[in-house]
Curated annotation (Swiss-Prot):
One of its GO terms (cellular component) is cytoplasm. The gene is eIF5A. Functions by promoting the formation of the first peptide bond. It is found in: Cytoplasm. The keyword Transmembrane helix does not apply. SUPFAM superfamilies: Nucleic acid-binding proteins, Translation proteins SH3-like domain. It comes from the Archaea. CDD domains: S1_aIF5A. Its main location: cytoplasm. Gene3D superfamilies: 2.30.30.30, Nucleic acid-binding proteins. PROSITE patterns: IF5A_HYPUSINE. This is Translation initiation factor 5A.
Amino acid sequence: MSKVYDTLGNLKVGSFIVIDGEPCRIVEMSRAKTGKHGSAKANVVAIGLFSKAKKTLVAPVDTQVEVPVIEKHVGQIIADMGTMYQVMDMETYETFEVEKDSIEEDIRNKLGVGSEVEYWVVMGKRLIIRPR
């Protein structure tokens, strides 16, 4: 299971949400009551984990939204293959590839062959978060 459901009103800045099929981190959130008989609305601004694109969502606070399940693991970079890193999981010894473009610039500068990294598995995709 890579997603669960939660009420939009329960989420806070720093939480994760799925908008347009992409997992995102909430960077700004505001709530407003629309009038005497209207329900409160939430305005969510989020940044995509993989595309780094800004996404917005305006919906009632009692709306059920998808929240991605994030699995955190430790791995080691075993090869630099130009546009990708080959990473080995430190628990299962499984190897996989991660695109360098999905890693932030300042983190990418600290990485090299033999570096231990923390990576997340989000909705079936892997993302290197930080060196250990």
